[in-house]
Amino acid sequence: MSGFEQLFPGQLPRLVMFDLDGTLIDSVPDLAAAVDNMLLSLGRKPAGIESVREWVGNGAPVLVRRALAGGIDHSSVDDVEAEHALEVFMEAYGASHELTVVYPGVRDTLKWLHKQGVAMALITNKPERFVAPLLDQMKIGRYFKWIIGGDTLPQKKPDPAALFFVMKMSGIPASQSLFVGDSRSDVLAAKAAGVKCVGLSYGYNHGRPIAEESPTLVIDDLRKLIPGCLDTAAEITLPDAAQSPSGNAIVVVTRKLWMKVIKALARWRWRA
């Protein structure tokens, strides 16, 4: 039985919200290269890709602080040093995304959902300046009507503000929505928003199995959401989706737009 059949018997969700890094794309090679360039420029030893793989998931500022600390706990890192290091990292990371790849099954799944008329959004803790160009480079940006970066709103995951925002903008309730991610932050945000959550086992999650975070469902291939797509005789052969008409234009949510809806969103503000 497919993931959708288990989570939404007899129907499909009307809205699917996705995380980005560790869910749709493997960006760690580029992130690790930027982290190592940053550390070398500061006279430090490089961290290496495996360490960076365990540090990602909470946004660039936290990644940089973990790199400076050499581990998950970054409480001892000096704020001034971290701010300077972040500037160095952002410049290094913005220079290249050549090592980033889309995970197997992602394009097939997005294409299938688009064909079924399911609305899709992207909610990531990655700084918004990198998100749209990266999606375009990976050729998957056209599938998302709402794109929210980690610095778009005042809050980022695990706060559910972005999920509430997208559901408000789409007019689709939590009961007909789904969040797909790979980390504890994703699961906590989905639970706080009252949304079912699919956890992907191949993601990052700081080196811990995603099942430990108790998402609604755990899968190891995004195509397992789709009824019958991974049956022995099944094969997805969908044509490329047409560009969205102007009435369904992609919305890259910016800080200016956020200020216009802050009053509507405030009543959903999550308090830990």
UniProtKB/Swiss-Prot annotation:
GO terms for cellular component: cytosol. It holds the Pfam family HAD_2. Gene3D superfamilies: HAD superfamily/HAD-like (3.40.50.1000), Putative phosphatase, domain 2 (1.10.150.240). Its cofactor is Mg(2+). Signal peptide: none annotated. InterPro entries: HAD-like_hydrolase_sf, HAD-like_sf, HAD-SF_hydro_IA, HAD_2, HAD_sf, PGP-like_dom2, PGPase_prok. CDD domains: HAD_PGPase. It comes from the Bacteria. The active site is at residue 19. Disulfide bonds: none annotated. It catalyses: 2-phosphoglycolate + H2O = glycolate + phosphate. Mg(2+) binds at residues 19, 21, 182. PANTHER family: PHOSPHOGLYCOLATE PHOSPHATASE. Its EC number is 3.1.3.18. GO terms for biological process: carbohydrate metabolic process; DNA repair; glycolate biosynthetic process. The keyword Plastid does not apply. This is Phosphoglycolate phosphatase. Pathway: Organic acid metabolism; glycolate biosynthesis; glycolate from 2-phosphoglycolate: step 1/1. Specifically catalyzes the dephosphorylation of 2-phosphoglycolate. Is involved in the dissimilation of the intracellular 2-phosphoglycolate formed during the DNA repair of 3'-phosphoglycolate ends, a major class of DNA lesions induced by oxidative stress. Belongs to the HAD-like hydrolase superfamily. CbbY/CbbZ/Gph/YieH family.
